[in-house]
Amino acid sequence: MTKKPEQRKSNQPYEYTSLTKAYFMINRRNFILKSAGTLAGLSLWQKPSLATTNAIEEALILEPLKSKDGLIKKSYRPPNFETPISYFNTTFTPNKHFFVRYHHAIIPEINSDNWQLSIGGDAINKPLSLTLKQLQTDFKSVEIAALCLCSGNRRSLFNPPVSGVQWGSGAMGNALWRGVRLKDVLAATGIKQSALEVSFNGADSGMLRTTPDFMKSLPLEKVLDENTLIAFEMNGEPLPHWNGFPARLIVPGWTATYWIKHLTEINIQSHPADNFWMKTAYRIPKEGFKSGQFISQETQLNMPITELVVNSLITNLVDGQTFSSNKAIEINGVAWDKGDGIQRVEISIDGGKTWELTTLQKNYGRFSWRQWRYNLKPTHTGEYRIMARATSISGITQPLEPVANPSGYHHNALQTISIQLI
């Protein structure tokens, strides 16, 4: 497997010239202005207090996500920010409100004019290197609406708690992705019959040399799926920096751990990938989950997390809200699954005792979430316990409780929101 070079020349697509340039991307003048007041009271040899350290970090952190708006911080380094649920009331999540997920702290600036995608491996006949312009012009462009969802979305809702980024319900976003089919690009290399998996690497990296490079692989059949893309546009615009500029992998129906950002390297392999992020991380027990999606990476006890599970979310109500009982209340939400499509979404206003059908909105494709709507006509005052449950076309319905697993993946239990009518 090709290693990332320790140093890059200035004409390369990205540089690790300094921590501020590589990750924080802050404007030097703004940083000095923001941090000068904090540092002014310190003597030359005085150790900064925790409050001072936090203030300096705040000066660094407020700049990097200036292209984003209103996100909920989960961690600074690596940058992990989730989307407030209120932004899920549109078909496509606006780019500036789209969640941010990284495993590494160094997110380099990339010059798209110099960016190159290298394709190699022991299971191809002809290695290939592509510029962004070649990628955009030499292959047919396609669009697909698809939900990008972090494997650990809703992790904070597991009880007992599990370790990891404590995501709420906002580590996801629905977008219209434009790019080229991965299978078309790889066809130009002459894939050998020995090909088993294809691995992907991006430009981000860890602070320490010992940090495992974030690399993921896919089984060949998923790679050759016509819906798997290398995307360079998101909702009609070039990919935002924090969502993978200039090109990223799109794997509809699978969790976002495979959607490699800042894509730089693809390797077609005749053997299973054996790196940390495949053999140790992002794995779930076989008990309680469907197996068979990634056979070359399965063991007797566990397997990689792959396909999304059927799920739904109420998007315009919050727990404890108060409404007048004199008028109807519109309840909105979204539902999704691995790509079979949503057959129905039901809603209960009495804590699950009775259920009624909601009205499904326009279908933007089987990998997009499906919006739904329900008009609640109050019959009494007091508490209403609102629940929603989705059923896929394949007949799978959301469970009452999630399947427990060590890493807090696939939380798809029924959501309950209590509102008061007066």
What label would you give each PLM region?
Residues 28-29, 248:
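Short, cationic motifs built from Arg/Lys/His that form the positively charged side of catalytic pockets
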